[in-house]
Amino acid sequence: MIKIRELVKVESLEEAWELNQKRTNKILGGMLWLRLGNRNVQKAIDLSGLGLDQIEETEEAFSIGCMATLRQIELHEGLNALCEGLLHDAVCDIVGTQFRNLATVGGSIFGRFGFSDVLTMFLALDASV
């Protein structure tokens, strides 16, 4: 169970970074991975207002925000065309659609879980974080 004392919706990455320096504060995403243990969080840092849920395409690369969901990855036409469906195939069987609608790329990478198909997918693509 997770207990949150205060929720802070930050207005900048700098503010989030500053708050995250204290060990009892945690950045929130979909919160699915935080539920894996008992936690007491002094300040929960909400990044939802920072536009980090975007997938942007340039001529050189794709940029995937840390708040982009696994479902966004699964359905993104440009990413899947480039990778011949690899990203769709890597995430489409992760739990269920409702879970993928909430689970974020950032949480999947940061958690470094041994069962993570997302980590393997980005490793295979030689992605930069």
Annotated model-derived regions:
Residues 1-129:
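C-terminal structural segment of proteins
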